[in-house]
């Protein structure tokens, strides 16, 4: 599929003492929801911090919205205001009240919609519309409610790109489902002009809202593509124990018990299993991601 890129990267490299992120080529499609998937320490947050300008001491370059460079992101407020970001660290000062958090954003962002912010705080069950609640401090909120408060902030602005680092992690199952609805509504509101990038290891919970997946292990992209294309590239194989060893050499991932075996196979290699008593299924993104990660990690 041909597509425009909302963010592209070239020769990206960031070194730590015991970790190296190395991505020669990065293309994130415009108008879609892209998931950065990987285990803890794979490099997802490092990549996001580089994208949004939190980390500047790296090699390589980014291009935003097809025309703006890293330097323009830093020096041109109009470019930065097109991007909404939430991270895993402190977004609001702990001593701020909820009312102060609203007031600060009204000062910082010309396009901040205070009424929309209040509506989202209520809709996301962060606060009740009382004076007591408005004077509650950020430090008094649960991790989940702090995340929801960050989401309310970025969704109250007129952005073209949301970059969300692990937004689902502190949320309960119902709120993760709500987050998926919010992302879909955000994308649908601008007919292909808005994009979302988020990192996750809650693959199953976020699959419904993932259009494009980038799987990262040890600081490198090990698989990527539109989810529907990945589901055509791979296929789930199931069979009886008697055929397990014969099938194993073809399978991308493999697990077995007393009753049979299951694994993921590249669809192009399915013919190599001819003659075995097997059944096939379309894989979920979660099955694909776990299999790919297992093939690129010590946790097998």
Question: What does each model-identified segment do?
Answer:
Residues 1-25, 30-32, 73-75:
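A short, flexible loop at the N-terminus of ABC-type nucleotide-binding domains that lies
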Residues 60-79:
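Conserved ABC transporter NBD signature motif
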Residues 87-149:
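ABC-family P-loop ATPase nucleotide-binding domains
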Residues 162-166:
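Catalytic Walker B motif of ABC-type/P-loop ATPase nucleotide-binding domains
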Residues 180, 252-300:
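C-terminal coupling/interaction segments
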């Amino acid at each position: 599929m041909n597509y425009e890129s909302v963010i592209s990267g070239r020769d990206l490299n960031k070194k730590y003492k015991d970790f190296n992120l190395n991505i020669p080529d990065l293309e994130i499609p415009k108008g879609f929801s892209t998931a950065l998937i990987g285990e803890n320490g794979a490099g997802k947050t490092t990549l996001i911090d580089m994208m949004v300008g939190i980390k500047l001491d790296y090699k390589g370059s980014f291009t935003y919205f097809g025309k703006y460079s890293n330097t323009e992101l830093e020096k041109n407020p109009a470019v930065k205001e097109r991007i909404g970001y939430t991270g895993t660290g402190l977004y609001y000062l702990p001593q701020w009240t909820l009312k102060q958090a609203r007031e600060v954003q009204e000062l910082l962002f010309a396009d901040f919609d205070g009424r929309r912010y209040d509506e989202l705080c209520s809709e996301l069950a962060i606060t009740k519309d009382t004076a007591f609640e408005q004077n509650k401090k950020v430090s008094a909120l649960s991790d989940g409610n702090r995340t929801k408060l960050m989401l309310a902030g970025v969704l109250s602005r007129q952005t073209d790109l949301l970059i969300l680092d692990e937004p689902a992690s502190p949320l309960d199952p119902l709120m993760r489902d709500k987050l998926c609805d919010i992302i879909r509504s955000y994308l649908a509101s601008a007919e292909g002009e808005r994009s979302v990038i988020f990192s996750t290891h809650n693959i199953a919970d976020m699959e419904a809202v993932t259009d494009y997946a980038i799987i990262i292990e040890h600081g490198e992209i090990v698989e990527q593509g539109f989810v529907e294309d990945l589901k055509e590239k791979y296929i789930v194989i199931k069979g009886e124990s008697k055929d397990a060893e014969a099938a194993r050499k073809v399978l991308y991932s493999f697990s077995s018990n007393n009753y049979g075996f299951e694994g993921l196979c590249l669809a192009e290699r399915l013919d190599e299993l001819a003659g075995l008593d097997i059944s096939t299924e379309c894989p979920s993104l979660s099955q694909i991601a776990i299999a790919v990660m297992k093939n690129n990690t010590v946790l097998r």
